[in-house]
């Protein structure tokens, strides 16, 4: 495994931290410090991260790696249980969700039951023996007669011609991953068509697809290995920790949370997974519609239909053409409009209001409206950075086009355009963190002292990220000559470095001072 296929976490070396004295955090290189457990004391200055030690924590796997691993497990089980056929062991492992230890245990307890349940009634012999006869064999599908050598049967002895068997297996493979559990074509037969039978009967292309589905089952059934969720990515990642907090980096370039394993979510630092789940549920939950209704409508006192006020007058009518009952009432106290006049303060006022139960209802509505406004504040900013992140991702993918324009206009070296990719990658990282920082901020205790630090660091990161975005998006048409290009390049390069420091400061602030903050 190459260094590129390994991602590394970092732990703080306390001794080196003491030696570093007041060394600035800005000059410290680190990846995922945001989720390290730090003790926060508001009366003490935050310590430097000091020297960072590396720990290998996850591994990127390609198809060859998966094949080697799965084949190694098959061979180990084969040797332990003295089963002669790897195809039989493969079928047993798939039945046991690739749990080697559990398979061996169950096989030792009751091998006959396990094998029957797995569709391998005889691990010593998988296929029926061809008996040479003077006559032909009748295929049970097409009912045509064939020489025995042109037919095939599993140990269950349900014999079919090779063309029919081939067609049956290819259809199963075309239907998807469940083909690895394909049973014998005979009705109600539970014997599984093993790997060697597929290899013998179908084309090499179809057999390769079948093997790919076996590798897929190896990943899908393994809690420590997951496919990278990026569209079109062929890699998987193994993580040896059950609840990994840091993001993982796939060789395809996508960075994401291993636990969530969701392309749309990606890397949700600084939020914990549970917080993201809660936020996404809130965003899609119908209860939010109920909150809006409570905050912005009142129910007709007669038929209880929700009514939204669209004018200044307190005289409300529950419109029949909108499904109402026609009842006329006061918006403030919800009493009949016939009881309102000069004695109650006039038609545009109501001095009954404070004495009515409507006051209690309106207090609840006011609280709901306040909560809704707070949610919308954070949600709009979450969405804004989410959209900006998509733009940054597109800019990163199109950086080579801007590079070609620069090379052709200013006759510079290819190395002089490296800053473009660095800037877009930094923008992408910043936007992703800013997106989820508003989720984190929404659930942060409104009265906590740490909130001020959080919002201060968030504001700094947001401001300088926007400045870098503005610098990067400058039109090349405005760069009149080589000197103008060099000046622009220096500005973008410097701001890329600056925004990285602000991102690092934000990450360190969350890790060092906010991880123990009470979350509502």
Curated annotation (Swiss-Prot):
Its EC number is 2.3.2.31. Zn(2+) 2 binds at residues 156, 158, 184, 189. CDD domains: BRcat_RBR_ANKIB1, Rcat_RBR_ARI7-like, RING-HC_RBR_TRIAD1. Zn(2+) 4 binds at residues 257, 260, 268, 273. The active site is at 313. Residues 1-42 have a biased composition (Acidic residues). GO terms for cellular component: cytoplasm; ubiquitin ligase complex. Zn(2+) 3 binds at residues 228, 233, 250, 252. Disruption phenotype: Prestalk cell numbers are reduced in slugs and these prestalk cells do not localize to the tip of slugs. Development terminates at the finger or slug stage, and these slugs do not phototax, possibly because the tip region does not properly form. One of its GO terms (biological process) is sorocarp stalk cell differentiation. It catalyses: [E2 ubiquitin-conjugating enzyme]-S-ubiquitinyl-L-cysteine + [acceptor protein]-L-lysine = [E2 ubiquitin-conjugating enzyme]-L-cysteine + [acceptor protein]-N(6)-ubiquitinyl-L-lysine. Zn(2+) 6 binds at residues 330, 333, 340, 350. Zn(2+) 5 binds at residues 300, 303, 318, 325. A zinc finger (RING-type) spans 139-189, 300-333. Keywords: Metal-binding, Repeat, Transferase, Ubl conjugation pathway, Zinc, Zinc-finger. Residues 1-51 are annotated as: Disordered. It is an enzyme of class 2 (transferase). InterPro entries: Ariadne, ARIH1-like_UBL, E3_UB_ligase_RBR, IBR_dom, Parkin-like_IBR, TRIAD_supradom, Znf_RING, Znf_RING/FYVE/PHD. Zn(2+) 1 binds at residues 139, 142, 161, 164. It holds the Pfam family UBA_ARI1. Pathway: Protein modification; protein ubiquitination. Belongs to the RBR family. Might act as an E3 ubiquitin-protein ligase. Appears to be required for normal cell-type proportioning and cell sorting during multicellular development. In addition to being necessary for a normal percentage of prestalk cells and the organization of the slug, rbrA is also necessary for spore cell viability. Members of the RBR family are atypical E3 ligases. They interact with the E2 conjugating enzyme UBE2L3 and function like HECT-type E3 enzymes: they bind E2s via the first RING domain, but require an obligate trans-thiolation step during the ubiquitin transfer, requiring a conserved cysteine residue in the second RING domain. This is Probable E3 ubiquitin-protein ligase rbrA. It comes from Dictyostelium discoideum (Social amoeba). The gene is rbrA.
